[in-house]
């Protein structure tokens, strides 16, 4: 399992959450092929977010890059924020308690 972690600064957490829910329910926004799950971690004090997307392989992440770029174009920067970095990590282990 691999995780793609994109860091964003600025934007509007509430509008982003609302837009994501609406677009996913309507089918307007499709996640990248191969993405198993995703989560967004937000720090309201610094107005930063981490968007973490999980895939089975590094190759799937590489193949999804174009779709991630399209998703960035579909969401206005004043809502999504400015992407400051993208990193990929192998998931060493996971515990569900």
Residue ranges and their predicted role:
Residues 1-50, 56-70, 77-97:
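Short S/T/G/P-rich N-terminal loop/turn motif that feeds into the first structured element of a domain
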């Amino acid at each position: 399992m691999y995780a793609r972690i994109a860091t964003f600064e600025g934007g509007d957490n509430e509008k982003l959450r609302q837009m994501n829910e609406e677009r996913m329910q309507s089918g307007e926004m499709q996640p990248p092929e191969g993405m198993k799950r995703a989560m967004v971690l937000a720090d309201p004090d610094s107005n930063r977010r981490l968007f973490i997307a999980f895939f089975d392989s590094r190759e799937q992440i590489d193949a999804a890059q174009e779709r991630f770029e399209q998703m960035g174009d579909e969401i206005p920067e004043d809502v999504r924020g400015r992407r400051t970095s993208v990193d990929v990590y192998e998931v060493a282990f996971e515990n569900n308690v």
